[in-house]
Every structure is written in C-alpha cells, then in structure tokens.
Amino acid sequence: MASSSDSEDDSFMAVDQEETVLEGTMEQDEEPHPVLEAEETRHNRSMSELPEEVLEYILSFLSPYQEHKTAALVCKQWYRLIKGVAHQCYHGFVKAVQEGNIQWESRTYPYPGTPITQRFSHSACYYDANQSMYVFGGCTQSSCNAAFNDLWRLDLNSKEWIRPLASGSYPSPKAGATLVVYKDLLVLFGGWTRPSPYPLHQPERFFDEIHTYSPSKNWWNCIVTTHGPPPMAGHSSCVIDDKMIVFGGSLGSRQMSNDVWVLDLEQWAWSKPNISGPSPHPRGGQSQIVIDDATILILGGCGGPNALFKDAWLLHMHSGPWAWQPLKVENEEHGAPELWCHPACRVGQCVVVFSQAPSGRAPLSPSLNSRPSPISATPPALVPETREYRSQSPVRSMDEAPCVNGRWGTLRPRAQRQTPSGSREGSLSPARGDGSPILNGGSLSPGTAAVGGSSLDSPVQAISPSTPSAAEGYDLKIGLSLAPRRGSLPDQKDLRLGSVDLNWDLKPASSSNPMDGMDNRTVGGSMRHPPEQTNGVHTPPHVASALAGAVSPGALRRSLEAIKAMSSKGPSASAALSPPLGSSPGSPGSQSLSSGETVPIPRPGPAQGDGHSLPPIARRLGRHPPQSLNVGKPLYQSMNCKPMQMYVLDIKDTKEKGRVKWKVFNSSSVVGPPETSLHTVVQGRGELIIFGGLMDKKQNVKYYPKTNALYFVRAKR
C-alpha cells in the first residue's frame, strides 16, 4: 500500500510539473519575458567568454607535459595561453630555486607501473620528445654490488615506470656511465662493473663502449670507434652542437684522469684537443655544466681516498688552444659538503646540488627529525628533564645514548680479569685504562655515586656491609638502584639494580695520608681533583680512568628482568638488595667497611640529568617491552636520519668576474627527505626529478624507500 501511494504521489507531481511547464510555455508564447531570455543566455556561456587572466590561471594547474600539449589543440586562444603558461611555469620555477621557495613531492610504492629495482650509480637523462626520463644500469645495494643493463622510462605525465623491451646490441651491465641526449638518440659511454665472486681477487672491469638508443625505434646500437680514450667510469660528459665532451674519470687501479676527449657525434670519431695552462687535478665523480656554446663548468669531484674537491673550473673552448680557468668560490662554508657523490644540475643561472644538510639546522621533511653528530670533544651539560614523558617528545634529548646501526649504546669486548681462584672471568667493566663511558647517556654524579657507600637519596648502595675493604685488593660489587623519578607515572616502581657487574678497582689506602680534611669524593686521600666526566657520565675520580667498557643493552635488559622478578616476590627481596645505611663513629658521613678503614659517603647534592643512574635506554626497557628501539615514537622519526638539503650555486658572474657564489637560505623548505648519495638529478618541465641513490645503512627510515626513491622538486604555490 505504501508503495502504491508513493507512486501515485510521484505521478501527481509529474503531472503538476508538466502542467506548469505547459502553462509557462503558453505564457511565453503569448508574452515573452526578457528576464528568462537573459537567464537562458547566462546558462549558455562558455569558457571562451572568461577573462584571459582567469583562464590562464586555470590552465596553470595542468601538468606541463601531455596536458599542456592536449590543451593547446583546443583553439588558437588556448594555444597562445598555453605558451604563456609554459613560459611562466619555467621562469617561476627558476625564481623559486634562486629564492629557495620550493616544495617536495615523493612517490612511494604502490604507484602505477612496475616498481624499478633499487639502484645507485646509474645513468639518467630527460628526453623531451616523449616527455620521459630514461634510466640505465647502476648497482644494487648487495654484497656483490651486481650491476644492471636494463633500461627504464618514467612517463612524467602519468608518473608510471615503463620498461621498454628493446632490440639490437644491448650494453654490458655496468654503473658509472654517462647518458646524454643527441637529437633523437641517447648516447651511453663508459662505465664499470664488479667482478664475479668466483674466482676470487678479480679486478673491476671498465668499459670504453659507445651505445646509442633510439626511443622511436626502440633499438640499441653499438658504435665501434678507434683511437679513443681508455676505459673509464665516473667521468662527466655533455653535448654541445654535434660534439660530446668527456672529462676526467676513474681508470681503475686507483688511477684518475684529468684529460679532455671530444667525440664527433656525426662521424663517430674521437679527438683530444690541445689545452694550455694549468689544469684541474685528476678526479672522478665531478659534475659538468654547460655555460654556453664555448664554455663548460667543472664542479667538485674526488681524486682519491683523501682528496675530495670543492673547487670550480671553467673550460674555454676557443678556436685556438683550449684553456682552463680556476674560479673563486664564495661562501664555501654554505656550500654542499660532498660534491663528488651528489650530482649537480643547472637551473637558469644557478647550479643545484642536493647533499647532506648541516647538523642541527632543520628537521626532515615532512616529519623526520635530524640529530646532531654523536662525536663531540666536550659532552653537553645534562639539564633536568621536564615533566613530559620522553616518548611524547618528537626530538630526543642530547643525553640519550646514540643509536648506531640500529643498536643503542656502544658494544665493546669484555676484559678478562683474574679471580682469586686463578680462573679468568669476563667483566662488564675491565681493568684500569683510559677514561671511557661506563653507561652511555647515564649519569653518576658526585652527589649520587660513591664507592662503598651511599647517601639517603643516592642511587648507589652497597650490597652488603661486610664487603671486603679496598686495602685487601678485592673488587667492590656496586649495586645500582633506580630511584623514583619526578613527574613519572603513578604505576612506576622503584627498581633497584643490584646485579650489574661493575668492578671498580680501588687502590690500597695509604696510611701516610690522614683522612681529616679530605674531600668527601676521595678514597684514601687520592685524586683531589673534581670527578671526571666521560661522554656525559660522572664517575668517581679514581674510577673514571679505570673504566673502559660499556654496559650492553642486553645485559641491562636481563638485569631489569631479574629485578622485576625479585620485586614481584615482595618487599623482602628488594630490602635484601639495599640494607639500611649506617655511619661510622670515626668519620661522620661515612660507612664502615672494616676495622680501621672508612670510605666517605658523599653529601646529598642536586641530581644530574633526570636523577637516574641508568641510561635512558635502560629506563625505557624497564617501562616498555623491548619490541622496538624507537619505543613510543613512529619508526620514521629516527634520530639517525640525515636530511637532504638543496644547495644553490650562483653562476651568473662566471665568465665576467671569474667567480661563483653559494647562496644562503634561511627557509626550511630547502630541507627535504633523507639523504641519498650517487643518485641522479634531471631537470624536466618546471621541476627537478631525483631518483635512486645509496642510503646510509645507519639511517633507520621505514616510510621512505631506500634506493629507489623518487622525488620531485617544484616551485611552492
């Protein structure tokens, strides 16, 4: 019934609408209304009636590749506007690079197309005829560094990877080659490859082959030449008119070259020009930039293990003898730190390099955080911790132990010590040696740690009052207790660590030096200077030079598990670990160890750091299950991530004044994703494309691909 009534209502409404339309039509026939004509005219307007400024703004959102080409076919007006939009896109990008006003875009899996294999030291170039970036060869990050000879095409309109199955004579698998564009051909030259694992001790193989690839025919061709350069890799090349100029490179057996070779791309013949004057040092891995038809810029390079160059040279290709000209580099301290493994690309009157960002300057983009270098001559001062939990802070504090290769702390071999029975045992703390961290990131302050005794709020307590004295030559087993922390959660327990094997070898007390008037931080009148501090850890003065080992996270975790098991049995177990303190009548503020021997107890002092004697990793392992080293934080916010930053070199005064200048940016937009080396940088239409590279193994980044990363750098809107 309900359905029938609804259908009837619908039929009535339809009839009413038809009658209304008919009446309106009759009224229009009888007496037309100018308002309806105006409304009909307004609905029939097209985009051609829009102001050109508005239409040009709308067209600026199109992709500068295929969408521009398609829009230009609509009409003459759109063709003219698209030309203006393309001009503004290019010059707007050049201005954005000069001012550092850029934005980053990353392409991570999954995205359309077959994912390309991770690689570095590959070759890449931009081919404008089909608006694509071609990638050839490279190495993979494996034990054997296997090389590839595959060719990939990135469609920049759809951002899709396509592997063309070409015919002809394929090149050998190699890396470190150069790929340049000449007319409708891609020219591949040089390269190297690792030897096979068997037989052993084979040298690397270098190539002097020339291959051309035709994208229109999908065909590889091998070019045979004579009297050419030796086999090389890591060289640089560029095309000017119908010549390919090749400079430098590695020749194998730790030999570098600074020769210049010219390949006639019409006759496929090699020649070596005469060059007068001083020349750059032999190098490889440099960048080669075309200034004009008669000038080439050489930037950076590597001449060997201890020869990393940051210089700049001009090669003048006159009609007579060619000549080298060294350039003055201004603001070198603001330049790219490593030019030999980070290629450069020209954008307008600037050269862009993407290299490692300075420590502590800016975080990763968009949400990765950088960390300063863990190597420091003077450890930073420890400050009291705020009430916020560490897991809620996006940036770790400086007093935390560094994460090296995905592990916390520093693992060192255990020293062997002689026991009274003659057997050798491993100890977490070896015998006397140079000062070194005992607990990475922990804090044992003079007011909270002492030998053989403890104050009321000290985290160091003796295991037993009947411990043998230092004069008898025995080691003292110091039990460390985890004191309650200010601002901690209510369910946090007072954990006392009494099973950590820290052996502090004490010298016998001298009977000639009295105890009266001595500082409370000394034992037997030795070591009058203040306590030493090693890597942010305060230790007793005579102990700082005697500790050379480090407590591993595994030992701390096992100790904490044992403490939890003992604390769960009741307060009696924890009370056995920390007996009540007593004072010897012979020396106030000290505890008796044996007859006639006293060890002073330090007075209560202000807590160093957050008042704990264990490093932060131990405290986190005590509060959280050891599932991840980044407890309570996203895995992509690793403290070992080194961000990549855009560096811009101004080359407008290169020929007139003989200088280049690194630009200084205060904007954080120039800092991008994690740093990669041996990647490629290619300029497209109003953007830069960064692909691949070798990421440091210490960078524990989960949300970014390691060596098949694809980034786009564009002007910020």
From Swiss-Prot:
Residues 416-426, 455-469 have a biased composition (Polar residues). Residues 363-376, 570-596 have a biased composition (Low complexity). Residues 44-93 form the F-box domain. Residues 1-30 have a biased composition (Acidic residues). Kelch repeats lie at residues 132-184, 186-242, 244-293, 295-342. Keywords: Kelch repeat, Phosphoprotein, Repeat, Ubl conjugation pathway. Pfam families: F-box-like (PF12937), Kelch_3 (PF13415), Kelch_KLHDC2_KLHL20_DRC7 (PF24681). Residues 31-43 have a biased composition (Basic and acidic residues). One of its GO terms (cellular component) is SCF ubiquitin ligase complex. SUPFAM superfamilies: F-box domain (SSF81383), Kelch motif (SSF117281). Substrate-recognition component of some SCF (SKP1-CUL1-F-box protein)-type E3 ubiquitin ligase complex. Specifically recognizes p53/TP53, promoting its ubiquitination and degradation. Component of some SCF complex, composed of CUL1, SKP1, RBX1 and FBXO42. Interacts (via the kelch domain) with p53/TP53; interaction is direct. This is F-box only protein 42. It comes from Pongo abelii (Sumatran orangutan).
